[in-house]
């Protein structure tokens, strides 16, 4: 365990990482919360889940494709004039469309998650859920078990889902074709797939780690941190805050976009 601490100190003090003292202290404090000694065991099923999170992007895309016509489909069908001129067309009906989109999106995505998680666990068993992540790599800083890591990252993935649903609804309210919605949405979701980080610091890398595709990847072995003045946040916390804010911004804009739509 002394060797582990030496590795961590060497890693944090690597010049190329350009970590501030506050960031180093943040990671040292987190590492001090890791329970020792480590208990070893079998964890194959959980490791597969953690290493395959990015595949959920395809489920996320499928959900967004389904809800893309929620507003733009009305424009294409010419029913927008009827809906918007109705008594509750600009209020309750618009809200109902948004709520229905989120309920469908959450339920459909959850079904994908259940299938995606059950397959490796059925094949390799549930063993290892309570084991420390450090048995995979001793320098992992997060003081979590495999199950805790899966749940934390899954929470972030759901926030990404909600933000992307909000973006889809906003685009649908603003564009007259569902195809145009997807033309904008697909690159946002999948261009990061073809971009690779060259480190864990610098504007390029820190931005890349926050894009939708990369935000589904746990990156539990990387010391990715964001310093905002005197505040230091790890990747999980930063992603959660960012996508929660985006969701809160997108929803009223989507509602307003359909409400203000000019029938033509």
Name every feature range the model reports, one short phrase each:
Residues 91, 178-179:
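Residues that define the loop-to-transmembrane-helix transition and helix capping
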Residues 3-74, 95-174, 194, 220, ...:
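Secretory targeting signals
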Residues 126-148, 179-182, 187-261:
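Terminal transmembrane helical anchor/hairpin motif
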Residues 78-79, 166, 182:
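Transmembrane alpha-helix boundary/hinge residues in polytopic small-molecule transporters
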Residues 75, 81-82:
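Membrane-helix interface linkers and caps
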Residues 80, 93:
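Hydrophobic positions on the alpha-helical face of helix-turn-helix-like DNA-binding modules
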Residues 84-90:
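Short helix-to-coil transition segments within interhelical loops
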Residues 86, 174-175:
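Transmembrane helix irregularities
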């Amino acid at each position: 365990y002394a060797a582990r601490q030496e590795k961590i100190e060497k890693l944090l003090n690597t010049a190329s990482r350009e970590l501030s003292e506050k960031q180093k202290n943040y990671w040292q404090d987190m590492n001090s919360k890791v329970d020792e000694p480590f208990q070893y065991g079998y964890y194959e099923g959980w490791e597969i889940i953690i290493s395959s999170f990015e595949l959920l992007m395809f489920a996320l895309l499928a959900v967004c494709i389904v809800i893309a016509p929620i507003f733009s489909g009305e424009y294409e069908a010419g029913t927008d004039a009827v809906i918007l001129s109705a008594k509750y067309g600009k209020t309750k009906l618009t809200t109902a469309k948004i709520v229905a989109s989120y309920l469908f999106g959450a339920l459909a995505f959850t079904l994908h998650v259940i299938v995606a998680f059950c397959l490796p666990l059925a094949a390799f068993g549930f063993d290892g859920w309570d084991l420390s992540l450090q048995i995979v790599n001793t320098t992992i800083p997060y003081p979590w078990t495999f199950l805790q890591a899966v749940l934390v990252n899954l929470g972030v993935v759901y926030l990404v889902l909600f933000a992307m649903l909000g973006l889809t609804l906003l685009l649908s309210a603003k564009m007259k074709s569902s195809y145009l919605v997807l033309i904008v949405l697909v690159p946002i979701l999948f261009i990061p797939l073809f971009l690779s980080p060259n480190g864990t610091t610098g504007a390029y890398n820190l931005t890349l780690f926050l894009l939708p595709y990369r935000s589904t990847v746990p990156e539990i072995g990387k010391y990715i941190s964001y310093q905002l003045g005197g505040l230091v946040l790890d990747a999980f916390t930063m992603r959660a805050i960012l996508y929660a804010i985006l969701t809160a911004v997108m929803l009223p804009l989507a509602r307003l976009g359909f409400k203000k739509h000019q029938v033509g």
